[in-house]
């Protein structure tokens, strides 16, 4: 909807550009580079919230050389927690809810699997199930017949990460992605900018 996708994309590109210019080697260093760049380059409400996810993830991976499946799952939980704390009045049925369920899915799978791909697959599955339920949580979404745009953007990001982990290939910008017919349109539930504690820099 509107500019949600553009704002999220620009925020992620800030991190991608920072990594391209960085000599970060460890999981902790990469996470810190990404979080710092996103905090500086966040655009719009969705970008600010996304930057807070990675702020939490960075804290979870701080000082770590590598990242195990469990550490990854726990970092996702810390990311979700950080995003919730950044918003004074969190609204369910938004990207916040989707991120929370993604983290739950990851942590559940990490209890029985040490394979980070399996953990991310479970996280993505749970996230997509939750995304489809967002219209039931937000009347405006149900009335419009759409899912939450921020949540959809987060799922596209995670699906891209999963694709790269499984194939070693990066999805090029501009490539078409296939969404279910019922999700052709998305809408971002409005989150008042004033309710976000950590704003972005311009």
Q: What do the predicted segments below correspond to?
A:
Residues 1-202:
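N-terminal loops that bind phosphate or other acidic moieties
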């Amino acid at each position: 909807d509107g500019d949600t996708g553009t704002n999220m994309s620009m925020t992620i590109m800030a991190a991608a550009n920072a990594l391209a210019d960085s000599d970060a080697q460890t999981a902790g260093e990469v996470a810190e580079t990404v979080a710092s760049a996103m905090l500086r380059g966040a655009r719009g409400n969705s970008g600010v919230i996304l930057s807070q996810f990675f702020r939490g993830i960075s804290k979870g991976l701080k000082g770590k050389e590598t990242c195990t499946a469990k550490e990854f799952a726990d970092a996702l939980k810390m990311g979700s927690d950080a995003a919730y704390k950044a918003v004074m009045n969190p609204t369910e049925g938004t990207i916040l809810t989707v991120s929370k369920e993604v983290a739950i899915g990851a942590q559940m799978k990490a209890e029985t699997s040490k394979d980070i791909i399996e953990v991310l697959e479970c996280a993505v599955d749970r996230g997509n199930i939750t995304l489809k339920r967002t219209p039931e949580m937000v009347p405006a979404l149900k009335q419009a017949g759409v899912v939450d745009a921020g949540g959809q953007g987060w799922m596209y990001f995670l699906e891209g990460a999963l694709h790269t982990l499984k194939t070693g290939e990066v999805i090029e910008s501009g490539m078409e992605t296939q969404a279910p017919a019922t999700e052709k349109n998305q809408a971002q539930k409005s989150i008042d900018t004033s309710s976000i504690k950590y704003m972005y820099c311009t």
